[in-house]
Amino acid sequence: MKSKILMKYRSLLVRIYSIVFRIIGLLPRNEKLIIFESYSGKQFSCNPRAIFEYLEENKDKYDYQLIWSIDKRNKDLFDNSDVNYLRRFSLKWLWYMATAKYWVTNSRLPLWIPKPRNTTYVQTWHGTPLKKLANDMDEVHMPGTTTEQYKRNFLKEASKWDYLISPNAYSTEIFRSAFQFKKTFIESGYPRNDFLHKKNRNEEMLKIKERLGINKDKKIILYAPTWRDNSFYAKGKYKFNMVLDLESLKNQLCNEYILILRMHYLVSENINLTEYKEFAYDFSDHNDIRELYLISDILITDYSSVFFDFAGLKRPILFYVPDIEFYRDNLRGFYYDFEKCAPGPLLKTTEKVIEAIHKTKNYKQDENITSFYDQFCYLEKGDSSKKVVEELLG
């Protein structure tokens, strides 16, 4: 009974908020106001952050008010910084959001938020697609929705976007189909990857390792798997089953390597690494995955789009995919021949992963990896943020 009353109350509140938002949205735009958001306000990261940082660095040319929209549970990320922020769905947020000239976000906004007519909505998205997305998915296995409803809601939200940032021509064609997007693409490469092409990379790497308390004399392996649509606790909270044998990795690699874990932001697990102290570290809550890319010598992943970003560093990538047949045939499916074209070996056991790690000592880019780089990373030259800002603001 209580839950039904609560649901009705929330539904009424959302309706009222939406009406008020719509009314405020009729007022003139604040032409100098840009609202940023990353992963529904959970992070200060990704493409919105890179665009924000570029604008901050070029204040003389771009005199704008820059404000972040954040989830109240994550305000500690901003409390110790000079970044201006508003708590998502607060009354002040509602006013600023409804009157801002620009929205810059990397994931979908709630459907109940109406986009004012003269607001420019910039969708940066957050990855080069390997697994099928939105309208291209044959079947949706996520909690709290059906395939038809998921696609309908996704496309309704995508219809509000004015600009969509694409990392390459491959992604542009897929986004056009998956999101049914018919407005303006900015095919610029991903702004977030500008960080990986800084001139002072070695100096930056040392600073990051020192700040994170990581041994500077050991090589770093980054393990960054994705989530599984059909393995969840509730809507937006996904399970992760650690199949990779950390004990074996520690026993055979600890003298030379450190392992960093970075779970997907939708995964709810807290991985207990007590037994693997000084070998394995959980940096899932680390706000900026770009820093983890930069300090890592090797990436281990599965079907996560992180490998497209990491490939720009031209370092070894290993794919730990014990469930590849099920994932390919029953969950998402892939846009291209992953098994043939992946820029690294596909491995199904921890033993094979360890063997492959040892082989990276003689790592050389073969024709397959060079071809992959030329298809997916050719726009990543450190100037993507500049391209986006010039397209939007001149």
Curated annotation (Swiss-Prot):
Top-rank EC class of the record's enzyme: transferase
Family according to the record: Belongs to the CDP-glycerol glycerophosphotransferase family.
Q: What does this protein do?
A: Catalyzes the addition of further 2-8 glycerol phosphate units from CDP-glycerol to the single glycerol phosphate unit bound to the prenolpyrophosphate-linked disaccharide. The function in the cell is unknown since the product is not part of the poly(ribitol phosphate) teichoic acid found in the cell walls.
InterPro entries xref list: Glycerophosphate_synth (IPR007554), TagF_C (IPR043148), TagF_N (IPR043149), Teichoic_Acid_Biosynth (IPR051612)
Q: What is this protein called?
A: Teichoic acid poly(glycerol phosphate) polymerase
Stated induction or repression of this protein's expression: The gene is not expressed under normal growth conditions.
Its chief place of residence is membrane
Catalyzed reactions per annotation: 4-O-[(2R)-glycerylphospho]-N-acetyl-beta-D-mannosaminyl-(1->4)-N-acetyl-alpha-D-glucosaminyl di-trans,octa-cis-undecaprenyl diphosphate + n CDP-glycerol = 4-O-{[(2R)-1-glycerylphospho](n)-(2R)-1-glycerylphospho}-N-acetyl-beta-D-mannosaminyl-(1->4)-N-acetyl-alpha-D-glucosaminyl undecaprenyl diphosphate + n CMP + n H(+)
Classify the protein's membrane topology as the record does.
Answer: Peripheral membrane protein
Q: Which UniProt keywords apply?
A: Cell membrane, Membrane, Teichoic acid biosynthesis, Transferase
Q: Where in the cell is it found?
A: Cell membrane
What does the record give as the organism's lineage? Bacteria, Bacillati, Bacillota, Bacilli, Bacillales
- Species: Bacillus spizizenii (strain ATCC 23059 / NRRL B-14472 / W23) (Bacillus subtilis subsp. spizizenii)
